[in-house]
Amino acid sequence: MKRIPFIHLMAVTMVWLIAFNVVPALGPRAAEVQTRAEAGQNADAEFQAMLARVDGAQLELQNGRPAAFKALWSRRDDITLSGGFGGTIEKGWEQINRRLDWVGTQFSKGTNTIERVVANASGDLGYVVQIEHLRFHVPGQAAESRRDYRVTMVFRRESEGWRIVHRQADSQMTKQPAQ
């Protein structure tokens, strides 16, 4: 039989007693933990609100209006965009701003359905992985176009609130064998 060190046994017992409120947690450390937990809940609510704004702004973008989506991006030099239309990876606000203006010219009469795979935030960083199903018209064309994207976005909390710092999208929705 494996022997458990006495100090380890005491620590586990205290955690259990506090967790099940048999004995209240004592001292300022308990207050710090509670404050951090409450802050995490607020951050989660703020992050979820940001995701809702992103969803609405993307719909605007898919209708040829990029301003709302652009407003959600950080203006720092370390941001990146690897867009679903292919091409180079854009870096920094100046390049991303131009790219998003161009993307806005590619869409009209758009709708989307977003399947969130996972969304999480911790501290000042957050991320979302999702599948986006887009239906839109290319301006000047009558036929409806369809695109399905696998998307990863990274967010950072800045002085203005949560901001997008990276977006990657691709249309590789089926497994591709090595060739």
What are these regions (language model features)?
Residues 1-7:
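N-terminal secretory signal peptides that target proteins for export/translocation
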Residues 2, 23-34, 127, 148-175:
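Short beta-strand edge/turn micro-motifs at domain boundaries
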Residues 9-24:
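Bacterial N-terminal signal peptides
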Residues 20-75, 124, 176-179:
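Short, low-complexity N-terminal intrinsically disordered segments enriched in polar/charged residues
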Residues 44, 48-49, 66-122, 131, ...:
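A solvent-exposed, acidic/Ser-Thr-rich amphipathic alpha-helical stretch
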Residues 130-137:
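Generic short beta-strand segments
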Residues 139-146, 174-179:
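A short acidic/glycine-rich loop-to-helix N-cap element
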